[in-house]
Curated annotation (Swiss-Prot):
Protein name from the UniProt record: Cytochrome c biogenesis ATP-binding export protein CcmA
Root EC class: translocase
Membrane-spanning ranges: none
Species: Caulobacter vibrioides (strain ATCC 19089 / CIP 103742 / CB 15) (Caulobacter crescentus)
GO molecular function, one term: ATP binding
Residues in the signal sequence: none
Gene for this chain: ccmA
Amino acid sequence: MLRAVLIKDLAISRGERTLFSKLDLTLRAGEAATLVGRNGAGKTSLLRAVAGLLRPAAGSTAFEDANGPVEADTARAEHLHMLGHQDGLKSSRTAWEELRFQTLWTGGNEDSARAAAQRFDLRRLLDLEVRRLSAGQRRRLALARLAASPRSLWLLDEPMAPLDAGQRAAFGAVMAEHVAGGGMILASVHDPLPIPARSVEVGA
């Protein structure tokens, strides 16, 4: 389990334009932080840089567990789960096939997958192909996949957007349990998360 993420002097550019620079952030076990800023400020790009999907113009992201530094590729492959604007679901699978496959692939088990399906009110949808689900149902499936995963660092890009009030409350409870168990959350948001989180301003 990761115990810290250390972002140092990070800068992100798009073409000739610097989105932000000299950003420092340390996130430790049991903490959540929200990235705030205007549209186009670089919040999603920051998440992608932490995930290793985008090369920063400057700076670094380092990871630590209880024994000290963890090689970045290992940390990302074994301890990180990112949920972006797109749900990243395979449309030809049934909801259960997708949830089960992704849960097992990230180190979880069928019991945790079934518990997550129940928590997000997906049981009646599990035999349906993902392509037949509504946008809100697909988001709930993606969140169930996240909840069933034992990975300690969650990177979330507008995770609450398509959810109704009841599902927002359910996901809020899942996030609270994740950080209470020593997990970490870094989220790009327009609206505040329903859990305690410090705010990090992103912008040039």
